[in-house]
Amino acid sequence: GIPVNGMENGSVYWSNWSGLADVTNSIQVQRGIGLSKLGLFSVGGTVNIVTQSTEVNRQGSVYYGIGNDRYQKMGFNLSSGLLPKGWAFSIMGTRTTGDGYVKGTNFEAWSYFANVSKKFGRNHILSLTAFGAPQWHNRRSNKQSIEDYDLHKDGIRMNTCYGYINGQIVPTYSGYNEYHKPQISLNHFWQINGKSTLSTSVYVSNATGGGRKVYGKDANRLQYNYKTGRPNENTSLTPDGLIDYLPVMEDNKNSDHGSDAIFTMGTNSHDWYGLLSTYTNDLSKSLKLTVGIDGRYYKGYHYDKISDLLGGAYYKDNKLAWRDPDTKLREGDKVNQDYLSKILWMGAFAQLEYNREHYKAFVSTSVTSHSYKREDPGKYGAYGNQETYPVANVKTPWSNFVPFSVKAGFNYRFNGMHNVFVNGGYVTKAPMMDNIFVDNTPLSNPIPEKIATGEIGYGFNYRTLSVMLNGYYTQWMDKSVTKAIGSWNGPRACIPNIDARHMGIELEASYQPLEWLRVYGFFTIGDWRWTNDVNFPLFNEQNEKIGEYHAYIKNLHVGNAPQTSAMLGLSCMPVSGLTLGVDFNYYGRHYADFAAADRTDEKDRAEAWKLPDYSTVDLNLNYDFKMGTFRGQLFGNVNNLFNRKYISDALDGSDHTRETAVAWYGFGITWTAGLRISF
């Protein structure tokens, strides 16, 4: 039940939780706005991962796996089970390395998990858990034109975000990331009596890490233009199109004023403390009450620090107001930005469930207090200019929001095999912190986002056949977006009050005609569109407003995800212990991503470029066997079996065509195989 979505932008970075699958006891998935085991309300649904505890038997395992492009993973997992005096222990560790499918994307990741649990009598369990996944990885951040992929020797594995120094791969801007987000939680479960329970978690997460940036007046010499996928006019390149560091390093070395292009680490660390407590009570045989609180305090640390002078003796920076701009800076010194983000969150929720033989109903509500604050001593003009930029202004006032939600649903079961259901809800949501601050200035009068959503569906379950059909309609109002224009660090558009409509139909089914054969699949089709034109301000790097613009996006499809998808799968067990599976996947009506701030021409209301539809085939194998007192499990996966060439992501171009879009191709054929020995 502990939340993991980022407090500032709402994102989930799965690399922070690598290895968690090896200690997962169960996964609770709630789709849409239906009845949830959690009080937290998410429009799309929630995934709750429950890790090992006193319920796990005494066991252990070791694992080794390999895959394409020198992928390797090794790990172990040990659990004591419940010991005679009520204690239970679990520990897990893994290491994963590889070169990556795309050129220059090698990585190394570790993960660890430890749990100590103690049962006190029959009614209390205390559990202390610590886990994390320190990792570093090189990445491809630039999309390229389709023509560039066709002409490049690496084809769809092409990557322009790196070069070589002394024979070693060296990523450039946004091409390297390192992070470690350990989390420690203390959980108490209390079976108060036969009808009521209280579950409480206190947790802390102290994360450190960030990503590489290129900084300085000659930064463009070490990066491509992200909108065109082409080099800048002065980008330093080798004959095969990689970043050529040597001329830049030579110029830095010979400079009489320090380096003109350096590497910095854009640090995004944080301290996050939280309390989550949920009380449940069976008021009667058919009525259940769940109430709870969710409190959080978050402090984010955002600064750039020099990581490599690239041959120079020092660097000078005039962006931080508290430091003399003539200071000679070395590795480890801060440049460009240095600010704190603070978030206070306190929420309460309640859910009432009514369950009878043929029908089930629920109503749920929540209210939350969100408060945002930013402290930015470094972004207030030139050094010593305190008359224009007084010191008191380095701290913003708190920006306060009180969002709430309410949802309700009804499910009717009849004839032992049919059910129909309807769910609806209304949510107000505080805009993410990243979308209300332009440097140290909050947007004037930011308002909460609002979501009205509903779904209706039918289910059929009889012996070997199950079918679920549902339709959904969601109106998202006053959404806020912040977007850099022209370049990664160019002018920023802060676009409030965007409305979108999402509606569609979803079908999923499973059929088992024989004991050893199962057929399953799904089909979804949606219509997701922006529904209004909006005004927005544009700010330059000095936080100065440079104009008001109008974005013409009404009726354009939302980009960056396929709006039609389907899958048909077969799973068979030809012999005892052996499972073979094949999945046929289809994706269509995928519009390229685009920035609303780029749609300022009233005459240009053309749809973003629509990517070609594509399909892939995946295989999987699992074989369970015994070796004396040990249990073995051999498994493997082959994705994109026929090496289908397809575009998975794209950014729209100036005329919304294939020729001006920049894109990433999906991976060709990839595979993994592994062996687990359990005892």
Spans of model-derived segments:
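Structural signature of Gram-negative outer-membrane beta-barrels, strongest in the C-terminal barrel
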Residues: 284-288, 294-296, 330-476, 512-514, ...
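Repeated loop/turn-to-beta-strand initiation elements of outer-membrane beta-barrel proteins
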Residues: 59, 85-89, 122-128, 195-198, ...
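Conserved C-terminal beta-signal and adjacent last beta-strands/turns
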Residues: 131, 170, 411, 422, ...
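Short strand-turn segments of transmembrane beta-barrel domains in outer membranes
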Residues: 34-36, 46-81, 93, 97-103, ...
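Acidic/polar loop-and-plug regions of large Gram-negative outer-membrane beta-barrel proteins
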Residues: 117, 125-187, 212-264, 327-329
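Short acidic/polar hinge/loop motifs at secondary-structure boundaries
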Residues: 4-31, 50
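Transmembrane beta-strands of outer-membrane beta-barrel pores
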Residues: 64-70, 82, 95-99, 132-136, ...
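Gram-negative outer-membrane beta-barrel transporters
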Residues: 285, 355, 473-475, 495-596, ...
